[in-house]
């Protein structure tokens, strides 16, 4: 029958097989989904799935913990849904797919919340207690929202980095890497946020545009004889005029701390005579610099930077205050460039990594490094001229003093990309502080490879999805500085060291003491370190040592979850001894946003490399960020954010899930109201297809009605062969964590293969043949296998809908309770499947051409439905033979009342002729047939319908 209005059986004395199903047309997702969530919670579905997979090989997706603060945003939803789809897709293969969700609980954002609620100045122990309570409340809210999205996991026992066992094991991990020789203390410039009052991890730094003062500053000549020798000029030439070596900087606030100048050894530098005096700049920058300073000049001499090594120049503020009466030597550095500026870099070792490395390479002791900027961004009161001022406020004042000194050549505003704290969105600096580090290039005590070498080798042994992630992470590890492990915070796991008050050395029994502290933390949390009296562990030595007050970087918290979760708190579920084999890994997959190449992926790799000498994961999957329909980043200030809770309440979580699954996560994920409307339309097509399948299986019992494949009609064999071929593609996509091709192919299958062809052809047979006929049962056999396969394909992403349909479909089977304890369904593949696929592809091409002709006739008003038409097809040999094999069933495939087939002349094209039928319409099947009224007892029926209702039934062979 055509896909137009169906006859209503109750009004006809000639009924058709129109069945109903409890699976409704409308999903009513916002109302029904919470009921499913409640049902899954009540029946402990995750545990039930795990029990069904007992003894199977485990698949471990280790959860990168979200931070326990604030409401979920759409990025959280993307991440958790992707993880859920991976777990479900793997579980349906029969693996024991384990997912223990977790939360990152320590750190500055929660400290800030406690400060907002209770004010500053609370005792540390009280801050920790209140932070713990706050995080617990935040976790409860987020957990409910994650479950609402249909995400299955061990929500009853998630891992929390603030659980006592996890905190204790983190201290133990610190002890391990200390024993191995990776940890050291030193003065180094680190990313420093004034608002946090602490060092920042690399992953806590973001870049934003900022306008600063850019200045060109002259350092007056001091070592005339050395300069004369370098440039091969007479000393009298240099004494005849004032002279400067000129630097360019965008950080005027660092000038008071200048201690050296950096030149490239191989760049040529020019001595230039100008009306203002003698100047030294890179030869290639002379023209640009003179133009900028509105000077004319002549190059007197040149020399390579190497010739100026060690030459000294006066500090530009020396004339303004005796506190700056010092000279700055030239040090050579390969990092100096001549793209901008003067080709000379001023070096303040306390405030730049390369500056620091350069000065340390020239044996500058820590005690001589000038470091007047305090942790809050204010100069120490002892700094001449600028003491007590905030560095940003001091910038213009420094410029004025330099101008007054006669050493300023230029000052103007300069827009550039600059480091900011990701939490406070405020500018940060490099600041030399005494910190604890994990050394990237330190030789460990066992004499094996350095941390950098081990981590880079681990990257090569890791699978990346998408593949470009490998090079990205490689570059980050290859170029990163030592890891600053210490933080100056309160709500964090302590670096529980006892440090000698005079020498700063660690207690010689530190590994043993760390274990004793860990045992206390395991009983009562990190608060135990605050209340611990050193005498309890050190006895009479206590007066010689003090407790280290630093806490561990929160990236060490989450970066060691492979140690304190997989091997620790949740080892019973997550740990497999095979992970300890040389090629073994603790987790099959880590899955996070692309920012985690410098975050969790990064810290986890470093900690595992130190602890085990290899990565903790077999594979890394990276997804992009969410943007709006115009490609803009989600931002509250723009007003383009979309809350997942609102979508779930308005459209259903299933729509979010389908959106995530249908989007290529390797790039940006665009979302908008318009995009979601299209997702809803796609969902309806899938749901309507399911409803049709389930309705037409209402009176089908596979145990009673299954037929051997050789008894199926040919088109049914084709449909199942097509389903099997598609399943192979679907599973191959799932195997490499690809979801959007699965959705695209499922939608094509529903709309084109099923709705646009097979089901359209099938309706006549399903509705009009005898209920228990082979023709109808053959169709139902095919529908049964198609439905079962299809429900499993969609279960990873359309979890609510698949489960709802499964309750209808699988009633009375061993897996009635849930689809998720079953596995992907392998339908019986008919013999000669590949030949069937090829043959029916040709038949469908012909049908497509016939449909075009029918549509043209319909537009002309000559027919209404396609059943009002009769068609003649003239085809070449191979196509003719394929069509001829269908016999009279060809008309059912073309959905016309009659179909005639002719053989085209050799080499002739496909020719289709369509004409309106001149016959009467059968009341029951709506076909226009010459035999309507052949039986006077049933004048409105065709012969086929009288046979199906009152006789032995029609015979079908192909369709």
From Swiss-Prot:
This is Isoleucine--tRNA ligase. Its EC number is 6.1.1.5. CDD domains: Anticodon_Ia_Ile_BEm, IleRS_core. Its main location: cytoplasm. Keywords: Aminoacyl-tRNA synthetase, ATP-binding, Cytoplasm, Ligase, Metal-binding, Nucleotide-binding, Protein biosynthesis, Zinc. The lineage of its organism: Bacteria, Pseudomonadati, Pseudomonadota, Betaproteobacteria, Burkholderiales. A motif ('HIGH' region) lies at residues 66-76. Belongs to the class-I aminoacyl-tRNA synthetase family. IleS type 1 subfamily. One of its GO terms (molecular function) is ATP binding. It is found in: Cytoplasm. It comes from Ralstonia pickettii (strain 12J). It catalyses: tRNA(Ile) + L-isoleucine + ATP = L-isoleucyl-tRNA(Ile) + AMP + diphosphate.
